[in-house]
Amino acid sequence: MKQALLISFMLALLTATSAIAEKVRLAVTSSFHNSGLSDHIIPHIETDLEIDIQLIVVGTGQALKLGENGDVDAILVHSKPDEEEFVKKGFANHRREIMFNEYVIVGPSSDPAQISSAKNLLEAFSKLSKAMVNFVSRGDFSGTHKKEMEIWNKINFVPDDIGKKYISVGSAMGKAINIAVAFDAYILSDKATWLNHKNKGNLQIQFEGDRLLHNQYAFLPINPAAHAHVKDQTVEKIEGWLVSEKARNLINSYLIENVQVFSFNAR
C-alpha cells in the first residue's frame, strides 16, 4: 500500500513539474506587437515548444540595450546596421532574418505637402521638408525612428530646421500615430501597425512602394558567452520554429483589412 502511494506521489510530482513551462524573455519591437502579429504567432510557439514567452515590447534601440545587458534571452528587431554591430560586439552569435514588411508615409487626407504625387521616397521627403507641415517622429531610437533619420540624411536635411512643426514624441508606434492624428500630421509608420490601428482620424497612406521602405525583421539569440544565464538551448528551439514551414504559413497568412502585411523570408 505504501509503495503504491509512493509511486502515485512521484507520478503526481512528475506531472506537476512537467506542467510548469519554462519561461523565456523575448524583447520585441513595438511594431511586431502593435501590428497584432505577436498575438497571431506567439501562442503557437508556446504550445508547440511547451514554453512560456514573456514579451518585452520596446523600440529596437531599447531591445538591443536589454540584450546587451543580458536582461532578455533573445530579441526580434528591425535595424540591420545596429544588429550587425550587436553581433560584432559579441552580444549575439548571429542574426537570422525572419520576415519583412514595408514602411509607409501617412498624412492628412488633403495631402498639403502633395507627397502622393512624388516619383520616389526621397522626393516625398523633400516635399515634406519644404512644405512646413506638421510631422510626428517616434524620436525613440527605434528601428522606425532610425529609418526616418536615414531618409532625412539622404536628402541632407535636418528635420529640426522646421521648428515646432517637427514633433518628436519619444513614443512607441501606436502612441505616435495617435499624436499624429491629434496634430493632423504626417508620420512614417510600418504598414501593418497603421492598418491595425483603430484611431486613424483624418489620416491615410499618402506614399508607399519605394524600395527604400523595405522593413526587415531579424531574430538575435543572446550570446551565452556574454551572459551565461540566458536560455540558449530553448532560444535555439524558438529560432528553429521561426524558420519552419508552420511559421511561413502563419506569417504569410496574417491579413489586416484583407491585406497581407508580412512576408516570410527566412533562410
What are the functions of these language-model segments?
Residues 4-15:
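Bacterial N-terminal signal peptides
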Residues 17-21:
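Sec/Tat signal peptide C-region and signal peptidase I cleavage site
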Residues 22-50, 61, 65-71, 80, ...:
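Exported/periplasmic ABC-transporter solute-binding proteins
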Residues 53:
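Hydrophobic anchor at the start of a short beta-strand
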Residues 74-100:
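Acidic, polar ligand-binding/catalytic clefts
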Residues 105:
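Serine endopeptidase catalytic core focused on the charge-relay Asp
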